[in-house]
Regions:
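N-terminal Sec-pathway targeting helices
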Residues: 1-10
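Periplasmic/extracellular electron-transfer cofactor-ligation site
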Residues: 29-30, 35-66, 90-101, 128-137
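Histidine (H) residue identity feature
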Residues: 22, 33, 46, 70, ...
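Extracytoplasmic electron-transfer domains, predominantly the class I c-type cytochrome c fold
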Residues: 59-128
Length: 148
C-alpha cells in the first residue's frame, strides 16, 4: 500500500511539474511575441520601457494628450481588457466615440495591422511588467466587465 501511495504521489508530482513547465514555456513564448510586437508597433510612442511620453497628462499644442505610459505609473491598468482591445483595434477616437466620449485622440487603430492574438500578446507583455497590485486590479476590472 505504501508503494501505491508513493507511485501515485510521484505521478502527481510529475504531472504538476510537467504542467508548470508547459505553462511557463507558453507564457515565455507569449511574452517574447508580445515584446516583439510591442517594440514594433507601440514603443515609438509609448516608450521601449513602457514609460510613455513626457508630460503625458497635459495636452500638447495640437490639443492631444501625449502617449501615456503603460507601466504602473500610467492608467492602462485602470481599464478592462475589452476597453484596451477596443482602443488598440479601433484607435482612441473611435473607441472613445463608442463609449459616448468625443475626443481627438492621437492613438491610431491597429485592427488592420494586428490580429486578435497579436493584440492579446501585446497586452500580456504589458501586464507582465506591472506589479501584482496593478495586475490584480486590472483583472478585477476585466472580470466586472464580463471577463473581456
Amino acid at each position: 500500500m505504501k508503494t501505491s501511495i508513493l507511485v501515485l504521489a510521484g505521478a502527481a508530482l510529475v504531472g504538476i511539474i510537467g504542467a508548470a513547465l508547459h505553462i511557463s514555456a507558453r507564457d515565455g513564448a507569449t511574452w517574447s511575441r508580445g515584446r516583439a510586437l510591442y517594440d514594433a508597433n507601440c514603443a515609438a510612442c509609448h516608450g521601449g520601457n513602457l514609460e510613455g511620453q513626457p508630460n503625458w497628462q497635459s495636452p500638447g499644442a495640437d490639443g492631444q494628450l501625449p502617449a501615456p505610459p503603460h507601466d504602473a505609473t500610467g492608467h492602462t491598468w485602470h481599464h478592462s481588457d475589452a476597453d484596451l482591445i477596443a482602443y488598440i483595434t479601433l484607435g482612441g477616437a473611435e473607441a472613445l466615440a463608442q463609449m459616448g466620449v468625443t475626443y481627438d485622440s492621437g492613438m491610431p487603430g491597429y485592427g488592420n495591422q494586428l490580429n486578435a492574438e497579436e493584440i492579446a500578446d501585446i497586452l500580456d507583455y504589458i501586464k507582465s511588467r506591472w506589479p501584482e497590485r496593478e495586475r490584480r486590479y486590472q483583472a478585477e476590472r476585466t472580470a466586472s466587465d464580463g471577463g473581456q
